[in-house]
Amino acid sequence: MHTDTDEHWMQMAIEVARSKGSDPATAPLGCVIVLDGKVIAAERNQTKELPDATAHAEMMAIRRACEKTGELELRGATLYSTLQPCGMCTMASIWSKVGRVVYGAGRSDVHPMYFEAKHVDTLGFIGDAYRDDIEIEGGCLRDACAELYYGPDADLNKEEQANL
């Protein structure tokens, strides 16, 4: 169960996501990584700006957190993401030894365009991972996070859809 502290950090992740704007077509994801009660990274999705297909909010935050700490491992850190991490970001969390992942909106809360892999559930990645010391929890400020994105039943033409 998420705590008031989790909600505080998730609200910060929402603010980071909103710094990209309010258009759900731009995939305004936000991510905050907290260690020992302090933010060590706060990033948003930057795939279009860089351009870099791996510049998801979680990937950027993990990079910044490792730079800030000077470490490859983020043991004891909690990663807060406004959207359920994709497979790439989930595996990066595992490999960087993040201790806990807390996300807001899940796959079923948003349009399928936000998830490239239609049959791969990141929760399955966690469950089958070689690490058993990572925790994952979804639904923290779910509704507020889901408002950032197109809804699951949004009628979008192909030109409007993109996995960003």
How would you label these PLM feature ranges?
Residues P28-G37:
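Short beta-strand scaffold segments in enzyme catalytic cores
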Residues I40-T47:
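Short beta->alpha transition motifs characteristic of CBS
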Residues A41, E58-E67:
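Glycine/small-residue-rich phosphate/adenosyl-binding loop
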Residues E49-M60:
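A short, polar/charged loop-to-alpha-helix boundary motif
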Residues S81-G99:
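Local cysteine-cluster metal-coordination motifs and their immediate loop/turn environment
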